[in-house]
UniProtKB/Swiss-Prot annotation:
A GO CC term assigned to this protein in UniProt: ribonucleoprotein complex
Location within or outside the cell: Plastid, Chloroplast
Keywords: Chloroplast, Plastid, Ribonucleoprotein, Ribosomal protein
SUPFAM superfamilies: S15/NS1 RNA-binding domain (SSF47060)
Identification of the protein by name: Small ribosomal subunit protein uS15c
Annotated organism of origin: Carica papaya (Papaya)
Length: 92
């Protein structure tokens, strides 16, 4: 799975739990878990709200990373197989 390969990649860096990449990675895992949960439980509105909050946090971290280091941002997007936001793509 993506998680194991990315964690082994991140373990090479000693500051993995606080780095932007690791935070985005953990938010992405939470988003995927919540998405599969919501496919079964469509009326779970609290989980929907939690998903929206996590999506916003991940989006803010990704926009921060794209402003600070565009190369690391592109690598992270490709590794996690997530789409680039339209807002971020217009910034650069």
């Amino acid at each position: 799975m993506i998680k194991n390969s990315f964690i082994s990649f991140q373990e090479k860096k000693k500051e993995n739990s606080g780095s932007v990449e690791f935070q985005v990675f953990s938010f992405t895992n939470k988003i995927r878990r919540l998405t599969s949960h919501l496919e079964l439980h469509r009326k779970d509105y609290l989980s929907q709200r939690g998903l929206r909050k996590i999506l916003g946090k991940r989006q803010r971290l990704l926009s921060y990373l794209s402003k600070k280091n565009r190369v690391r941002y592109k690598e992270l997007i490709n590794q996690l197989d997530i789409r680039e936001s339209k807002k971020i793509s217009f910034l650069n």
